[in-house]
């Protein structure tokens, strides 16, 4: 991606390597100029998949054959699968890739590729195994409350060190990142490295330390990275940082981290090593679990349904029927597994399989433990961080589709779970509930759950009960006026 290309091209180590980066904002004419002035040198073009067409156009303009004269290397080729669901153009160069005389794909965390052209062209898999012990220790912090677990993890790290080390946090959600920084009062001491749109989004919240390109001088005590920086970027620090990965499946499923690819890549960013690795995660038993065979069976069935509907579309007798069948075709699941020409997109299919298998890891803590235990790159240790109220309760409280009455029922249920609120953590939870609905929290503190339920959550009746309770305990002289105001609306 762009940060990697810019980083490589600007690296002093490569100043004599004749590198040329191609991405958004670099045009065909720029590539032509580079090719013309590099006639007696090796061409070394680094391009995003989305900009590959500009490289092709430049070669064609100069009547040169890139297929014959160049070696095409797909670096970090696991991204062809991992990003296929949201970067539709990442596979654009793949048809050209198979036309090159000399070509290869490389990755430290490869994923099985099922495109039949690999077999047709007799591709070989070459695996390089280190001769040294490369396993790293990782702590899995299982929790029902990612915010509080993150806070406690930071507190532990800060208390253990005389000279604080950088803390690098990988979360694929700028919404979660901003929430963590704000709630834990880290805004002044944090930097965020993310996509340009996310930089703008954070800017609208008055946060100015957000960047689309990484550089060491932009780092702070706490450094947050989204998926744009999970792979290939070289982070060379004099100190060995603490690495924290965070997954919140309740807030955003796309924060799931794959132990076999994502986790390895994140740790691999730090060329001089790390001090510790922690993965904080909740789990969600509602996530469907499927075997690889079941997932493939679903794809086969989806394909047959698509073919049947496509046949109806092709045989439709009139325009109205064709429009109806076209709409049906576009809504079918298999439609997402086709390229722009209507052919099977094998990388989209591989992506679906990979994503569905990854969901299995987050069904329960045992599944995630097993995934890390089976990964050759880590030695995992587990620790539980469980609290009175967690992410599931937050999700239920923040559900915008529920009625006010249902929301208040949920808040009362959570107040019951909290009890007397003796710890600072419990007081924080209660402040969150007050922010969500101060009336029902005050009502609970004044008249209690039983009275609220007897009055069937009627705001008018609960308010009367609160006034009467306060009068019986300590009269202020204003109770009658308050009761009248509660019973009548001005102007009616």
Question: What positions do the PLM features span?
Answer:
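Conserved strand-helix element at the start of the C-terminal RecA-like helicase core
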Residues: 1-9, 45-49, 153-185
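Conserved Walker A/P-loop ATP-binding site and its immediately adjacent core
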Residues: 1-27, 49-53, 111-114, 173-175
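SF2 helicase motor core recognition
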Residues: 34, 51-64, 107, 216, ...
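SF2 helicase catalytic motif II
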Residues: 48-52, 60-104
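Interdomain hinge/linker at the junction between the two RecA-like core domains of SF2 helicases
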Residues: 108-156
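Conserved helicase ATPase core of P-loop NTP-dependent helicases/translocases
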Residues: 198-226
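Conserved SF2 helicase motif VI
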Residues: 250-277
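The feature captures the C-terminal accessory region of ATP-dependent helicases
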Residues: 297-492
């Amino acid at each position: 991606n762009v940060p990697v290309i810019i980083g490589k091209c600007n690296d002093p180590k490569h100043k004599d390597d004749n590198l040329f980066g191609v991405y958004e904002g670099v045009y065909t004419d720029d590539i032509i100029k580079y090719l013309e002035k590099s006639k007696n040198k090796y061409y070394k073009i680094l391009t995003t998949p989305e900009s590959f067409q500009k490289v092709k156009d430049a070669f064609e303009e100069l009547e040169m054959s890139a297929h014959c004269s160049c070696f095409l290397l797909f670096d970090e080729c696991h991204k062809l699968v991992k990003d296929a669901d949201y970067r539709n153009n990442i596979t654009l160069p793949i048809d050209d890739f198979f036309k090159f005389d000399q070509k290869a794909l490389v990755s430290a965390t490869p994923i099985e590729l099922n495109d039949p052209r690999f077999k047709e062209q007799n591709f070989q898999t070459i695996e390089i195994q280190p001769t040294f012990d490369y396993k790293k220790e990782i702590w899995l912090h299982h929790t029902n409350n990612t915010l509080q677990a993150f806070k406690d993890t930071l507190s532990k790290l800060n208390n253990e060190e005389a000279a604080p080390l950088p803390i690098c946090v990988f979360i694929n959600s700028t919404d979660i990142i901003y929430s963590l920084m704000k709630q834990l009062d880290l805004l002044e001491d944090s930097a965020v490295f993310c996509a340009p749109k996310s930089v703008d989004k954070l800017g609208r919240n008055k946060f100015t330390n957000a960047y689309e390109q990484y550089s060491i001088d932009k780092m702070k005590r706490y450094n947050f990275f989204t998926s744009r920086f999970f792979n290939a970027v070289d982070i060379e620090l004099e100190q060995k940082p603490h690495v924290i990965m965070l997954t919140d499946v309740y807030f955003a499923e796309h924060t799931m981290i794959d132990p076999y690819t994502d986790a390895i890549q994140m740790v691999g960013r730090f060329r001089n090593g790390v001090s510790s690795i922690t993965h904080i995660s909740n789990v969600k038993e509602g996530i469907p679990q499927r075997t690889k065979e079941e997932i493939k069976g679903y794809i086969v069935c989806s394909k047959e349904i698509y073919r049947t509907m496509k046949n109806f579309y092709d045989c439709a007798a009139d325009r109205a029927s064709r429009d109806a069948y076209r709409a049906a075709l576009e809504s079918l699941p298999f439609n997402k597994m086709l390229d722009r020409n209507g052919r099977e997109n094998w990388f989209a299919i591989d992506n679906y399989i990979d994503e569905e298998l990854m969901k299995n890891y987050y069904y329960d803590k045992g599944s995630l433990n097993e995934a890390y235990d089976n990964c050759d790159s880590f030695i995992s240790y587990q620790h539980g961080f469980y609290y009175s109220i967690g992410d599931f309760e937050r999700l239920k409280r923040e559900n915008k589709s529920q009625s006010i009455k249902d929301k208040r029922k949920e808040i009362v249920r959570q107040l019951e779970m909290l009890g007397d609120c003796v710890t600072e953590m419990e007081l924080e939870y209660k402040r969150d509930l007050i922010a969500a609905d101060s009336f029902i929290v005050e009502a609970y503190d004044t008249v209690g759950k039983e009275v609220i339920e007897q009055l069937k959550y009627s705001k008018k009746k609960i308010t009367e009960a609160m006034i009467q309770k306060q009068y019986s305990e300590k009269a202020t002289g204003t109770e009658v006026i308050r009761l009248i105001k509660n019973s009548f609306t001005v102007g009616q």
